[in-house]
Curated annotation (Swiss-Prot):
Gene (UniProt): THRA
Ranges where the record places region Modulating: 1-50
Family recorded in the similarity comment: Belongs to the nuclear hormone receptor family. NR1 subfamily.
Assigned keywords, A-Z: DNA-binding, Metal-binding, Nucleus, Phosphoprotein, Receptor, Transcription, Transcription regulation, Zinc, Zinc-finger
Protein name per the record: Thyroid hormone receptor alpha
InterPro entries: NHR-like_dom_sf, Nucl_hrmn_rcpt_lig-bd, Nuclear_hormone_rcpt_NR1, Nuclear_hrmn_rcpt, ThyrH_rcpt, Znf_hrmn_rcpt, Znf_NHR/GATA
Residues that coordinate or bind 3,3',5-triiodo-L-thyronine: R226, S275
């Protein structure tokens, strides 16, 4: 430390004391220089700009002055804890403050902070600091919402051609979807005693209630026929070779039937309505032959209920499932892929038009395609067991074909 001439002779101090002071200064200097090498430096600072208090490398504009992190923290703690009345100086307040000596005299360092213009009134107490942080977070959230709304406003709506395609697909769905929007009024609940007493043993440990299975097979043929009719009403589908049409229908039939059942999930009665007419509970569908597939369809129904899909969205999702170019054995793979892309683009633009409140609605909805694919795969495995355990005469021919 530098000080005014004094009657005290520094050489009169014990040698050990002088050695310890020097060692402490060197160690302090090394730590401070090391800490100043890292950290974010704002773009408004000149290269190697110095702290106006101690001369160390400045990190920004703090309490109305350009200072380093060390002097910023020292000033803040001093004011927040009201420490300055307790500070004292051994050398009559005449210490020179630099990055090596700054930690050795708190009073002179604080006086230097004040003399260069650091503002005490800008230091916030704990409650004000918490309030400021909260305000910053609220502003960030507000800006994020504004940006999201702005991005939604700039997302394209369907073009005139896409609206025409959307209309065709929607009408195809409505004309082939049993009971339409009146399914709740027209549904009939499967009697509770059916599907509660499994009889035929299955190889995987589950059992099949043959009475429930028989009830389900009565509605399966009309349900499959309606899926076929839906596909035939789509102009792009009818332009494909018959071989490809058959492959696409076999591939998507279970997926579309599962989707049509899932969107008719009723949380109040905890039922799915099959083919627009038969309301069944989870255990009934499970014991009626579907086993774990029943859980997957019910779970899908629960999750889709939050999406509040309209007829058009269900119809377009069905068209996307139908036009899947990765089905094995297809001839016109490229043409089918382009058809699906056309449906997907129109679908995405329609989602933009609808302006759902669910964050990331579009990608979340597309994930349901994967869920439906998994349901189909599980059903295919389950179907092999059913063919072994259930009487052949109970299977409708069309069901066996798809």
């Amino acid at each position: 430390m530098e000080q005014k001439p004094s009657t005290l002779d520094p050489l009169s101090e014990p040698e050990d004391t002088r050695w310890l002071d020097g060692k402490r200064k060197r160690k302090s200097s090394q730590c401070l220089v090391k800490s100043s090498m890292s950290g974010y430096i704002p773009s408004y600072l000149d290269k190697d700009e110095q702290c106006v208090v101690c001369g160390d490398k400045a990190t920004g504009y703090h309490y109305r002055c350009i200072t380093c992190e060390g002097c910023k923290g020292f000033f803040r703690r001093t004011i927040q804890k009201n420490l300055h009345p307790t500070y004292s100086c051994k050398y009559d307040g005449c210490c020179v403050i630099d990055k090596i000596t700054r930690n050795q005299c708190q009073l002179c360092r604080f006086k230097k902070c004040i003399s260069v213009g650091m503002a005490m009134d800008l230091v916030l107490d704990d409650s004000k600091r918490v309030a400021k942080r909260k305000l910053i977070e609220e502003n960030r959230e507000r800006r994020r919402k504004e940006e999201m709304i702005k991005s939604l406003q700039h997302r394209p709506n369907p073009s005139a051609e896409e609206w025409e395609l959307i209309h065709v697909v929607t009408e195809a769905h409505r004309s082939t979807n049993a009971q339409g929007s009146h399914w709740k009024q027209k549904r009939k609940f499967l009697p509770e005693d059916i599907g509660q007493s499994p009889m035929a043993s299955m190889p995987d440990g589950d059992k099949v209630d043959l009475e429930a299975f028989s009830e389900f097979t009565k509605i399966i043929t009309p349900a499959i026929t309606r899926v076929v009719d839906f596909a035939k009403k789509l102009p792009m589908f009818s332009e494909l070779p018959c071989e490809d049409q058959i492959i696409l229908l076999k591939g998507c039939c279970m997926e579309i039937m599962s989707l049509r059942a899932a969107v008719r999930y009723d949380p109040e009665s905890e039922t799915l309505t099959l083919s627009g007419e038969m309301a069944v509970k989870r255990e009934q569908l499970k014991n009626g032959g579907l086993g774990v597939v029943s859980d997957a369809i019910f779970d899908l129904g629960k999750s889709l209920s939050a999406f509040n899909l309209d007829d058009t969205e269900v119809a377009l999702l069905q068209a996307v499932l139908l036009m899947s170019s990765d089905r094995t054995g297809l001839i016109c793979v490229e043409k089918i892929e382009k058809c699906q892309e056309t449906y997907l683009l129109a679908f995405e633009h329609y989602i933009n038009y609808r302006k759902h409140n669910i964050p990331h609605f579009w990608p979340k909805l597309l994930m349901k395609v994967t869920d439906l694919r998994m349901i189909r795969a599980c059903h295919a495995s389950r179907f092999l067991h059913m063919k072994v355990e259930c009487p052949t005469e109970l299977f409708p021919p069309l069901f066996l074909e798809v």
